[in-house]
């Protein structure tokens, strides 16, 4: 995995980061998304203190991430249960078809 030095504009500041080449566009998209979220939060709350706005945006993003992790865990459990049931059914079929 080769890295590329990339300049990203985030909240009006240029950040220079070493990024895997295949992730450059995703990082740029994430930076644009962060700018939008901060602008929307400033507009919504009327706050002008960047640190407070960033704290709220970070908390919202953290909450969304937690929700997605919980959803993923539930889906994984459903899939695991389904696979176990299929394995059990296949084993029953195999045992039933074995000559005695």
From Swiss-Prot:
Sorted UniProt keywords: Cell cycle, Cell division, Coiled coil, Cytoplasm, Septation
Compartment annotation: Cytoplasm
Superkingdom of origin organism: Bacteria
Chief place of localization: cytoplasm
SUPFAM superfamilies: Cell division protein ZapA-like
Gene Ontology BP annotations: division septum assembly; FtsZ-dependent cytokinesis; septin ring assembly
Coiled coil region boundaries: 21-45
Protein role: Activator of cell division through the inhibition of FtsZ GTPase activity, therefore promoting FtsZ assembly into bundles of protofilaments necessary for the formation of the division Z ring. It is recruited early at mid-cell but it is not essential for cell division.
UniProt cross-references to PANTHER family, sorted A to Z: CELL DIVISION PROTEIN ZAPA
GO cellular component, as recorded: cell division site; cell septum; cytosol
Family: Belongs to the ZapA family. Type 1 subfamily.
Subunit structure, interactors included: Homodimer. Interacts with FtsZ.
Protein name: Cell division protein ZapA
Disulfide feature: none
């Amino acid at each position: 995995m080769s890295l590329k030095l990339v300049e990203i504009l985030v909240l009006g500041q240029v950040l220079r980061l070493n990024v895997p080449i295949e992730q450059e566009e995703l990082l740029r998209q994430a930076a644009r998304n962060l700018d939008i979220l901060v602008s929307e939060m400033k507009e919504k709350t009327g706050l002008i203190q960047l640190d407070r706005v960033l704290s709220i945006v970070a908390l919202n993003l953290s909450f969304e991430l937690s929700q997605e992790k919980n959803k993923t865990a539930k889906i994984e459990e459903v899939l695991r249960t389904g696979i176990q049931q299929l394995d059990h059914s296949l084993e029953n079929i195999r045992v039933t078809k074995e000559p005695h």
